[in-house]
Amino acid sequence: MEQPWPPPGPWSLPRAEGEAEEESDLDLSPGSPRCPQLPGGGTQMYSHGIEMACQKQKEFVKSSVACKWNLAEAQQKLGSLALHNSESLDQEHAKAQTAISELRQREEEWRQKEEALVQRERMCLWNMDAISKDVFNKSFINQDKRKETEDEDKSKSFMQKHEQKIRHFGMLSRWDDSQRFLSDHPYLVCEETAKYLILWCFHLEAEQKGALMEQIAHQAVVMQFIMEMAKNCNVDPRGCFRLFFQKAKAEEEGYFEAFKNELEAFKSRVRLYSQSPNFQPVTVQNHVPHSGVGSIGLLESLPQNPDYLQYSINTALCSLNSVVHKEDDEPKMMDTV
């Protein structure tokens, strides 16, 4: 019998009582002295680079995570069969063992491919000029520009309006505190919140605030898992986040490992970018007044290679897309806001 989604986790990082305190000197707005501006066209390059980079990595990440997920299910099925002594189950037991063997082999193959991919990243094979030309030759640039612009404006407006609440959620360290806060502010359960938190992680790593980056990464992955669970169950994410927190406390073996691996992979990508030759923080002399557009400030405060950074962001997002699997025996039994 298949196990219910989602995998429990991520397990909260050790924190003091209540939630972690925000650092008072962390101003992420474009007007802040900590948020230098990218040269003209830099922000557009992020927008264009995201689609191309994500498409190139999507199949690899999906296969890798799906393999881990299926292996966990096969191991759990084998464990349940071991509880019975009936000879009629011998055939099922043999099938389960065979499946586990095949899945382990596939997992090792994808692990080797992942290591090779990381090596290519370290060698800086993401040539900015080549990527730029490739991006503008892709057919997706011919899609409806008006809708893209409207969606982007809507996203910026949301993050500008709710920046402080998103940051407050990012600082929470307890499952109950996170669930209670989202219950009070259900509109924060959305893609914009996940994107803001992910960009914040890169900003914190740029400031060498590793411990705080890990805390925000924890909450970013939580939000993305909620979003993927809602997509696979075809429900409003605001109606299923309570179920996520309920299952997150179960700590079932196998699913916990899948989630933990994805969280660690995301944090590794953030650190990898900060150690790359492309990581060259810039400073500016003149600053505009505070505008409060948090996500834009985060983006513009980072180094000037948008292709590599956006690839890292989207690899993190795409890697979570295949961790979630719809379950037939648990169809959309979601609570409502």
Swiss-Prot record:
Keyword Cytoplasm in annotation: yes
Annotated spans, Interaction with Hsp70: 267-337
Gene3D superfamilies xref list: Cdc37, Hsp90 binding domain (1.20.58.610)
Entry keyword annotation includes DNA-binding: no
Region (Disordered): 1-43
One annotated GO biological process: protein stabilization
An example Gene Ontology CC term for this record: cytosol
Coiled coil region boundaries: 84-122
Family annotation (InterPro entries): Cdc37, Cdc37_Hsp90-bd, Cdc37_Hsp90-bd_sf
Chain residue ranges for the region called Self-association: 2-171
SMART domains: CDC37_M
One Pfam family of this chain: CDC37_M
Location relative to the cell: Cytoplasm
Compositional bias of kind Pro residues: 1-11
Region called Self-association and interaction with Hsp90, residue ranges: 147-277
Family classification: Belongs to the CDC37 family.
Subunit note: Self-associates. Forms complexes with Hsp70 and Hsp90. Interacts with CDC37, FKBP4, PPID and STIP1.
Function: Co-chaperone that binds to numerous proteins and promotes their interaction with Hsp70 and Hsp90.
Name of the molecule in the record: Hsp90 co-chaperone Cdc37-like 1
Lineage: Eukaryota, Metazoa, Chordata, Craniata, Vertebrata
